[in-house]
A protein has these predicted regions:
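C-terminal structural segments of small proteins and small subunits
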Residues: 53-88
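Extended, hydrophobic alpha-helical segments
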Residues: 1-41
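Positively charged, polar, low-complexity stretches
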Residues: 11, 31, 37-47, 52, ...
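Alpha-helix boundary/capping detector
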Residues: 3, 34, 43, 47, ...
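Short linear sequence motifs
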Residues: 10, 23-26, 46, 70-72, ...
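Short, flexible coil/linker segments at or flanking structured domains
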Residues: 16, 21-25, 30, 51-56, ...
């Protein structure tokens, strides 16, 4: 599983990036997506960031990708809105 966290100042770029990520996983919080990954999906996301989105980023923008192992434990507190298990 990977977590993608982003802080993008431009509304248009941020919306486009969120729509792009939603093709691969689901939103955990406003700027955090959970993606059940394969090497191909991770490569696709990284290539898209480097080749498309980096051109639009300012010095204030960032994207952080956490590549988590299958043995990582996930604990949720509160009332999560997205409990999807299957992503197509």
């Amino acid at each position: 599983m990977i977590l993608v966290s982003y802080d993008i100042s431009n509304d248009k770029v941020r919306t486009k990036f969120a729509k792009f990520l939603s093709k691969f996983g689901f939103r955990l919080q406003y700027s955090v997506f959970e993606i059940h990954n394969s090497e191909a999906i991770l490569s696709n996301i990284e290539n898209e960031i480097q080749n498309v989105y980096m051109k639009s980023f300012t010095e204030e923008d960032s994207v952080i990708i956490f590549n988590l192992s299958a043995t990582c434990k996930k604990t949720c507190y509160g009332y999560a809105k997205n409990e999807e298990t299957d992503v197509f």
